[in-house]
Amino acid sequence: MAKGKFERTKPHVNVGTIGHVDHGKTTLTAAIATVLSKKFGGEAKGYDQIDNAPEEKARGITINTSHVEYETATRHYAHVDCPGHADYVKNMITGAAQMDGAILVCSAADGPMPQTREHILLARQVGVPYIIVFLNKCDMVDDEELLELVEMEVRELLDKYDFPGDDTPIIRGSAKLALEGDQSDKGEPAILRLAEALDTYIPTPERAVDGAFLMPVEDVFSISGRGTVVTGRVERGIIKVGEEIEIVGIRDTQKTTVTGVEMFRKLLDQGQAGDNVGLLLRGTKREDVERGQVLCKPGSIKPHTHFTAEVYVLSKDEGGRHTPFFNNYRPQFYFRTTDVTGSIELPADKEMVMPGDNVSITVKLINPIAMEEGLRFAIREGGRTVGAGVVAKIIA
């Protein structure tokens, strides 16, 4: 399929629909794309195009996800929708589709259901910063008091998982009516209200290049007469010749200065997020740096060994384990570019974890890794992926 030229004139924001099965996530996704395409241009997408989600792989895990794009007057949105509950769990944990904000779809006829709760918890655990609520199927509920009751329940649920329930925008409408072009308050106008909430409630995310410099170490070379060159892809920020950096993870943190930046064998004065570069480090020996460490702006990221995480364990069909694992299971944790062994502590009420489950765990690594909340990792056994996770909270 030919890729059209990407016009990046507006700020770009990543969003997605979450919520209980059959509450109307896919219908709403189709309605947003269709209604906004009429008003602001872009491609209308039908329900069938979105429901038929293509398979993709993230960290060795197969996930079905639909990607839709739409625009408002001020922004360009990339929106992800998943057909099944398991796909949501995998998507959110692997970060296959990082969300700057989520649209929680809740049926006014049913109120919050088990997956409504689970998706809010997942959003909290994996670091989705903002949630907007679309109260769907309002055309099926005549009773204003019932609508207010459902709205109150949703706000309480958001509060329970540390989202600001009282301040969360809740838009009432009917995705089905909107998709059919209905002009009543619950139809197309509800979608435009939702778009306005997206524009105003979710702040424009910081671009990778504006962050504090971070580059995972992929390879280390010794170049005679010049010193040690470390290669990798800059994850965020900018690095300029002459700047001081830290080498963090696995062993004690070291400070050094970047004396050269090269890309494709050409010398540059700086490297930035997305660039594959080689950095020449002053006075650093080849054996002082190894894969799995990171180079970073001094003080911007610290090494840690002890944290809680939300993980998804691959099923047997996905190439995962065939048997459950128990407390004190010791796999490898693959962070960025390397494996580190660690032990897993299960929640008190969980005796074991079955393939295909998702679970909150506590991990202790044998070596420290440069870590922040929201960092993704894979769980591996002898080089094959058996799970995926995200750091929820750092303990030490």
Curated annotation (Swiss-Prot):
Its gene? tuf2
Assembly mode: Monomer.
Outline the segment boundaries, as ranges, of region: G1.
19-26
Per its record, the protein catalyses: GTP + H2O = GDP + phosphate + H(+)
Q: Which UniProt keywords apply?
A: Cytoplasm, Elongation factor, GTP-binding, Hydrolase, Magnesium, Metal-binding, Nucleotide-binding, Protein biosynthesis
- Give the taxonomic lineage as stored in the record: Bacteria, Pseudomonadati, Pseudomonadota, Betaproteobacteria, Burkholderiales
The region called G4 is annotated at 136-139
Tell me which PROSITE patterns the record gives. G_TR_1 (PS00301), G_TR_2 (PS51722)
Q: What does this protein do?
A: GTP hydrolase that promotes the GTP-dependent binding of aminoacyl-tRNA to the A-site of ribosomes during protein biosynthesis.
Provide a GO CC annotation, any one.
cytosol
Locations listed in the record: Cytoplasm
Name of the featured protein: Elongation factor Tu 2
Recorded E.C. number(s)? 3.6.5.3
* Entry's Gene Ontology molecular function annotations: GTP binding; GTPase activity; guanosine tetraphosphate binding; translation elongation factor activity
Q: Which HAMAP family match?
A: EF_Tu_B (MF_00118_B)
UniProt: GTP binding residues: 19-26, 81-85, 136-139
In this chain, the stretch annotated as G5 covers 174-176
Pfam families, per the entry:
GTP_EFTU, GTP_EFTU_D2, GTP_EFTU_D3
Supply the source organism for this entry: Acidovorax sp. (strain JS42)
Q: Which NCBIfam families match?
A: EF-Tu (TIGR00485), PRK00049.1 (NF000766), PRK12735.1 (NF009372), PRK12736.1 (NF009373), small_GTP (TIGR00231)
The family this protein is said to belong to: Belongs to the TRAFAC class translation factor GTPase superfamily. Classic translation factor GTPase family. EF-Tu/EF-1A subfamily.
